[in-house]
Amino acid sequence: MVTHSKFPAAGMSRPLDTSLRLKTFSSKSEYQLVVNAVCKLQESGFYWSAVTGGEANLLLSAEPAGTFLIRDSSDQRHFFTLSVKTQSGTKNLRIQCEGGSFSLQSDPRSTQPVPRFDCVLKLVHHYMPPPGAPSFPAPPTEPSSEVSEQPPSQPLPGNPPRRAYYIYSGGEKIPLVLSRPLSSNVATLQHLCRKTVNGHLDSYEKVTQLPGAIREFLDQYDAPL
């Protein structure tokens, strides 16, 4: 069974059909925020559109821990879900859209501020470790739910400190590790080059020095993943 979505499947360019989305938009600005997110997700290659949680579990079952994908949420209160393979199996994390930003649904008892972003790709990139960074070991289990943040651990020499994030599910406390997206299609050479360029543009001045056509192409997808 496939959950209907008002958004087309990844890679398709037909107009959005607003009659099929179960969750309604709270404002015109939220509608535009979600439409922009979908456009970039379709370019990403790891947006699996209307697959269900069960189908996501099958897709990720043979993949190593840290593999993830983005799909339409089956929950009528949300637009997107992050499905990630962990050492304890596939976990599904709802992506909240409120106040003009996206965030992972967090543990309501946590006192830490929830990281928020104007783009789903930026949200995903935030939770990915930098190149060469080690994975965090699993801490002792404790009952809770959703996602929580903990202070940075002692970094290795030459590496900046990084906060650890954990998934709370069924009494387990599982490190949230996003290592590799699961591709839904074969990326073009242009897109691969664009991701590489995005990963090396660390200042606005560098972007403004590029030709206008290249800047426009980069603006359509401004993430390195």
From Swiss-Prot:
Complex formation: Interacts with multiple activated proteins of the tyrosine kinase signaling pathway including IGF1 receptor, insulin receptor and JAK2. Binding to JAK2 is mediated through the KIR and SH2 domains to a phosphorylated tyrosine residue within the JAK2 JH1 domain. Binds specific activated tyrosine residues of the leptin, EPO, IL12, GSCF and gp130 receptors. Interaction with CSNK1E stabilizes SOCS3 protein. Component of the probable ECS(SOCS3) E3 ubiquitin-protein ligase complex which contains CUL5, RNF7/RBX2, Elongin BC complex and SOCS3. Interacts with CUL5, RNF7, ELOB and ELOC.
Bias (Pro residues): 131-142
Modification note: Phosphorylated on tyrosine residues after stimulation by the cytokines, IL-2, EPO or IGF1.
Protein name: Suppressor of cytokine signaling 3
Region (Kinase inhibitory region (KIR)): 22-33
CDD domains the UniProt entry points to: SH2_SOCS3
Claim: Phosphoprotein is one of the keywords in the record: yes
Domain SH2: 46-142
Function: SOCS family proteins form part of a classical negative feedback system that regulates cytokine signal transduction. SOCS3 is involved in negative regulation of cytokines that signal through the JAK/STAT pathway. Inhibits cytokine signal transduction by binding to tyrosine kinase receptors including IL6ST/gp130, LIF, erythropoietin, insulin, IL12, GCSF and leptin receptors. Binding to JAK2 inhibits its kinase activity and regulates IL6 signaling. Suppresses fetal liver erythropoiesis. Regulates onset and maintenance of allergic responses mediated by T-helper type 2 cells.
PANTHER family on file: PHOSPHATIDYLINOSITOL 3-KINASE REGULATORY SUBUNIT (PTHR10155), SUPPRESSOR OF CYTOKINE SIGNALING 3 (PTHR10155:SF11)
Annotated SUPFAM superfamilies: SH2 domain, SOCS box-like
GO BP annotation list: cytokine-mediated signaling pathway; intracellular signal transduction; negative regulation of receptor signaling pathway via JAK-STAT; protein ubiquitination
Comment, domains: The ESS and SH2 domains are required for JAK phosphotyrosine binding. Further interaction with the KIR domain is necessary for signal and kinase inhibition.
GO molecular function per UniProt: cytokine receptor binding
